[in-house]
Curated annotation (Swiss-Prot):
NCBIfam families named in the record: A_thl_para_3677
Lineage: Eukaryota, Viridiplantae, Streptophyta, Embryophyta, Tracheophyta
Family of the protein in this entry: Belongs to the UPF0725 (EMB2204) family.
Classification via PANTHER family: (RAPE) HYPOTHETICAL PROTEIN (PTHR31260:SF77), CYSTATIN/MONELLIN SUPERFAMILY PROTEIN (PTHR31260)
Provenance organism: Arabidopsis thaliana
Modified residues (N-acetylthreonine): T2
Keyword Acetylation (UniProt): yes
Signal peptide feature range: none
Name of the protein in question: UPF0725 protein At1g23950
Length: 373
């Protein structure tokens, strides 16, 4: 590489660092006062801003609003509120297949005790995988009202592609599903000696307790297993109709699996939930509907109304009348980050979409087996 090329590359790196230094001042939410030197637009890897109030079109309109609702869901779980999305004002995103979204929105709480005024919220959602539901919300806060659970000031701002997708700096390590007392003591010693961050030990405790809420998503349970009332709570129709997050989970599974639906809101409007079961770490909790509030849960949703699901290398039976299944895992981390991971069940794995099933033919269901809990 020539001296001139080295100089140009170093100049580009300098501009890049300066962009992210400025973006970090607002945790990636407010970019209005950030300017780039002439000729560097399109060269610097940065966030792309979208003004939803002025622009008639912007990427993934349905999905971005679902991400905004997901952030409010996290806030409501932590604070016991009922905030709902009123208006998506703006968002910034990375130009990647797997992106991070920094959203500013207006929300209101319909509870009369909360008053009728709207609040401005900031929500950050990071995608962890392309073509399926795997997202994390690390920031969901009223603007200028952050606290430790909503955004950590202990670690520097890290954009997604730098490997710091979690805005509150949670350090992810590979941990077995069940740690022995000896292993926990060794981790505790390493933390005391300053060899590991303190939250690694906390993560280990969660891993030990997490069990079925780690690793791959479970298969759809058999009817006999679902009838185990100690293990599964069958959500009443009145409850899921009053609980907007269950339908939001379903819409997120479908839209993240097929992002083309993000410009087709009419597809989601046809969805009809048939039944819902929830599995939590706490069994026989009284009253049973308290399990709806669990920080760690598997939500099993049977639904219809999706005429032609699309998923990577899979085809499904066609028809809105077909009952389909989706599984969503919810895990609230010990520092307040909320993760959702989900999948559509069924379909046949093939190489080419030209082999699509005709209407009326039976699709392969998720393998039915008892889960180990």
């Amino acid at each position: 590489m020539t001296t001139e090329a080295n100089s140009t590359a170093e100049e580009g790196y300098s501009v890049q660092r300066d962009f992210w230094r400025q973006a970090a001042k607002s945790d990636g939410f407010d970019l209005e006062n950030i300017s780039l030197p002439p000729g560097t637009n399109g060269i610097v890897m940065g966030l792309i801003p979208y003004d939803c109030q002025r622009a008639r079109h912007y990427p993934f309109p349905v999905l971005v609003k679902l991400y905004a609702k997901f952030g409010l869901h996290r806030y409501n779980m932590l604070k016991g509120t009922s905030f709902q999305l009123a208006t998506l004002m703006k968002f910034n995103m990375l130009p990647n297949y797997i992106s991070s979204f920094y959203m500013t929105l207006l929300a209101h709480d319909p509870d009369p005790a909360a008053g009728s005024s709207q609040k401005t919220f900031q929500v950050r959602v990071d995608e962890q995988q392309f073509g399926s539901l795997d997202i994390n919300c690390s920031i969901a806060r009223p603007k200028h009202e952050g606290d430790l659970l909503e955004v950590s000031t202990e670690t520097p701002f890290m954009p997604h592609f730098h490997g710091g997708a979690l805005g509150d700096g949670i350090f992810k390590v590979e941990l077995p599903d069940c740690l022995s007392d000896t292993a926990l003591n060794e981790l505790a010693g390493a933390v005391l000696r300053g060899e590991l961050p303190e939250h690694v030990f906390d993560d280990a405790l969660y891993a030990r307790a997490g069990g079925i809420f780690q690793g791959e998503l479970p298969d759809w349970p058999s009817d006999d297993v679902l009838n185990d009332g100690k293990r599964f709570y069958m959500v009443k129709e009145s409850e899921w109709q009053a609980t907007d997050w269950i339908s939001m989970y379903l819409e997120l599974v479908i839209t993240t699996t097929d992002k083309s639906i993000s410009i087709k809101p009419e597809v989601l409007s046809k969805l009809e939930i048939v039944k819902v079961a929830i599995e939590t770490a706490t069994k026989d909790e009284e009253p049973s509907n308290e399990r709806l509030k669990a920080y760690r849960a598997h939500v099993y949703i049977t639904f219809k109304g999706l005429a032609e699901p699309r998923a990577h290398e899979r085809v499904f039976e066609i028809g809105e009348h077909v009952e389909r299944q989706a599984i969503v895992r919810r895990v609230m981390g010990h520092r307040g980050d909320l993760t959702l991971k989900g999948k559509l069940c069924g379909g046949q794995y093939i190489k080419k979409r030209s082999l699509a099933l005709k209407s009326g033919k039976k699709s392969q269901k998720c393998k039915k087996q008892a889960l180990v809990g």
